Amino acid sequence: MLFRSEEVGFVPKPLVDTTQRHMKAELLGHTYNAPFGFAPMGGTSIASYQGDLVLARAAANANIPMMMSGASLMRMEDVRAASKTAMFQAYLPGDEDRISETFERCAKAGFETIAVTVDVQVAANRENNVRAGYNNPLRPTPQLAWDCMLR
């Protein structure tokens, strides 16, 4: 058994000074105002104009963590410029040259933290996206407008 409830408990401390309480948390050498932030979400620009820039600016203003998705529709350089503590989540292709290019571009953009995502062993077959007319970056098409109206 991985978790035994009898080994975990809360210890109340009712007689302590609470005038200086805060939610600050340190993560990877940076102190943030909260122990939570924006997770990597590919395609936020579909939901909001320049969605990743909006999130990066909000994270910078609130001093909370923000990780840019490798599936973002925004340029990493622009997102990093909007938030000096933004991190980058990379889906690495199986090609060493492209991996090196990704890391070099992240370094040039100023990213200090890169999270490497390793949830699949083989790159996805995107034939269904091609047949459906999906392209990245997303471009307005009559079919896209029709799909949006239907949903």
Indicate where each model-derived feature is located.
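Active-site-adjacent beta->alpha loops and helix N-cap segments on the catalytic face
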Residues: 47-52, 68-88, 92-101, 105, ...
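N-terminal amphipathic alpha-helix/helix-capping segment at the start of soluble metabolic enzymes
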Residues: 10-36
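Hydrophobic faces of well-ordered beta-strands that scaffold small-molecule active sites
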Residues: 36-39, 64-68, 86-90, 114
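Glycine-rich phosphate/pyrophosphate-binding beta-alpha loops
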Residues: 40-46
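Short, charged beta->alpha transition segments
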Residues: 20-29, 65-78
